[in-house]
Amino acid sequence: METIVNQRKKTMYQQLADIDENISWGAIAKEYFDKSASWFYHKMDGIDGNRKPTEFNLEERIQLKGALCDLADRIRRAAETIET
């Protein structure tokens, strides 16, 4: 007998839960995607405005990864300018 395990894919919010409250997702949407905040939030939630499943496609996931890496670099550079 074969057992089929139905695993739900984590939403992007779930994957990025550690930084969720520290990031302005609306600013990421505008600056890196040239999209509205609502478009971005729907992708993050995994559900579109019509309550249908949605997610970032591969290109968008790569773009989001790059955006977060760019932001991390910018934060690091800003931190290094603080005189101690």
Annotate the PLM regions.
Residues S36-F56:
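Recognition helix of helix-turn-helix/homeodomain-like DNA-binding domains
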Residues S24-Y32:
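Short alpha-helical "recognition helix" segments of helix-turn-helix
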Residues D34, G46, N50, D70, ...:
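Amphipathic alpha-helical interaction surfaces
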Residues N22, D34-A37:
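Alpha-helix boundary/capping and short turn/kink residues
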Residues E55-I75:
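DNA major-groove recognition helix of helix-turn-helix/homeodomain DNA-binding modules
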Residues E2-V5, C69:
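Cell-surface/extracellular proteins and modules involved
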Residues V5-N6, D48, I75-T84:
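Short, charged recognition helix plus adjacent turn
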Residues I4-D20:
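Short, amphipathic alpha-helical "recognition" segments used to contact nucleic acids or chromatin
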